[in-house]
Amino acid sequence: MSRATRFKLYRALLIVAIVLIVPVIFIVGITLPYLFNTIKITFPDIVIDKDVESYIAEKELLFENTDPRAKKKIIWHDDAKIKTEYSIVYLHGSFATGRQQEEVLVKIAKKLKANLFISRLAGHGSGFESTKSLEAKNFLEDAAEAVAVGNKIGNKVILMGFSAGGSFALMAAKDQKLSEKIDHLVLVAPWTPKLSPPYFLAATGLFFKSQYKFNFPRMFDLPNEEWDPFWVNEFHRELPRQLWVAAFSGRKLEFLETKIPVSYTHLRAHET
């Protein structure tokens, strides 16, 4: 074999090695650590030692870019603003706000003669900047806060969650302290993070870009001028990262001995 032929062969082998090895190094060094990144699930003790509406208003003052209709809110059963037998607390899905389901939630609350609290997950509906410094624990705080508010406005708490909100609601119900403050659990298409090709590709893609833009209203055939404030159309990569970390970390939590009734609804569109 001539020197020129050997050189071509070595060069070809080197190219093949690079093509095969570089992706493996990238996957092992970037993608897998991201997907397997977890935290210890600990829910904070939320103490509301003041008027509950004042407490919520003060918390939301920190987020000036939030549309008033997307903020955390209590919808009282009547003008007396007193505790009802049941309270409904709602955790919405990822990249949305509680505005999307508010009309339905109000109808349910009226039917049950219940006060209603619609929460707002961290980084949702509050502008791009609020998505940059998120931590997974923020979503656990949201769930704990929702339960605390529910106990301030109702004698019995119905904790309801949709998609990612359903994941955090389920995790809250598995916590020993919080489970004692929850009387019913309603899960609508709860997000169950699992290692699959779509998540693998998404995790890899987040490495290359930090800022993302989507048009969620258009995806659902909704007018932008009306619905833009209630979707996370622009976000930093930390938002999906920390959502994943929070939900993935809680996937193996086990139910303690409990008698909490659970209502579960699954949507085929959420099979991922």
Cite the ranges covered by each PLM segment.
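Catalytic nucleophile-loop/oxyanion-hole region of alpha/beta-hydrolase
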Residues: 126-153
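A conserved short beta-strand
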Residues: 180-190
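The alpha/beta-hydrolase serine catalytic core
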Residues: 43-72, 190-256
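Short, surface-exposed "cap/lid" segments of acyl-processing enzymes
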Residues: 76-111
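Conserved alpha/beta-hydrolase
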Residues: 112-126
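Conserved small/polar residues in nucleotide/adenosyl-binding loops
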Residues: 265-272
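N-terminal membrane-anchoring alpha-helices
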Residues: 4-52
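Gly/Ala-rich beta-loop-alpha elbow adjacent to hydrolase catalytic centers
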Residues: 161-165, 169
